[in-house]
């Protein structure tokens, strides 16, 4: 059984498929009513599963006519998407942000599930046992190197 976040994520991804567009606009209240959940549940899904690292841009307007506009960052070639991810990685990166990048690579089939699990193991805070700043710098270097390898090999 999937949890509510998974169900909402799949629904939004299906909207992209059904409309065959790179932009989907949804209303918080409509989604909350459809799935009998609170709007904050939708916010959680958007903030964790439709991030830049996953290949999406979000525009949000609150209030009476509020909406969430989700735009797929479509790069027609692998190099464009990888370069987009490289721009997102600064001199350091948190474990969660790095996981989002790996999730995006997996989602777009640049890596398989086994490779994703190996990458998670390498960039995990339990593997990189050191002070937070050093850990985040090393993690960023690992992710950048990984992206370069995907880009050029």
Curated annotation (Swiss-Prot):
> Which Pfam families does this entry report, sorted A to Z?
CtsR (PF05848), CtsR_C (PF17727)
Q: Which GO terms describe its molecular function?
A: DNA binding
Q: Does the keyword Nucleotide-binding apply?
A: no
Is-annotated flag, keyword Transcription regulation? yes
In the record, biological process GO terms are: regulation of DNA-templated transcription
Name the UniProt key words of this record, in alphabetical order: DNA-binding, Repressor, Stress response, Transcription, Transcription regulation
Give the protein's function.
Negative regulator of clpC, clpB and clpP transcription by binding directly and specifically to their promoter region.
Query: According to its UniProt record, which protein family does this protein belong to?
Result: Belongs to the CtsR family.
According to UniProt, the name of this protein is: Transcriptional regulator CtsR
Top-level taxonomy: Bacteria, Bacillati, Bacillota, Bacilli, Bacillales
């Amino acid at each position: 059984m999937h949890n509510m976040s998974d169900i909402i994520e799949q629904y939004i991804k299906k909207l992209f498929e059904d409309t065959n567009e790179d932009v989907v606009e949804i209303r918080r209240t409509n989604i909350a009513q459809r799935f009998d959940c609170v709007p904050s549940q939708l916010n959680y899904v958007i903030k964790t599963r439709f991030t830049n690292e996953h290949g999406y841009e979000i525009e949000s307007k609150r209030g009476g006519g509020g909406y969430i506009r989700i735009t797929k960052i479509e790069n027609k070639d692998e190099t464009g998407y990888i370069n987009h991810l490289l721009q997102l990685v600064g001199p350091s990166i948190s474990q969660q942000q790095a996981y989002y990048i790996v999730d995006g690579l997996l989602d777009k089939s640049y890596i398989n599930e086994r490779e994703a699990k190996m990458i998670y193991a390498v960039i995990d805070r339990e593997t990189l046992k050191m002070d937070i700043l050093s850990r985040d710098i090393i993690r960023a270097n690992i992710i950048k190197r990984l992206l370069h390898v995907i880009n050029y090999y």
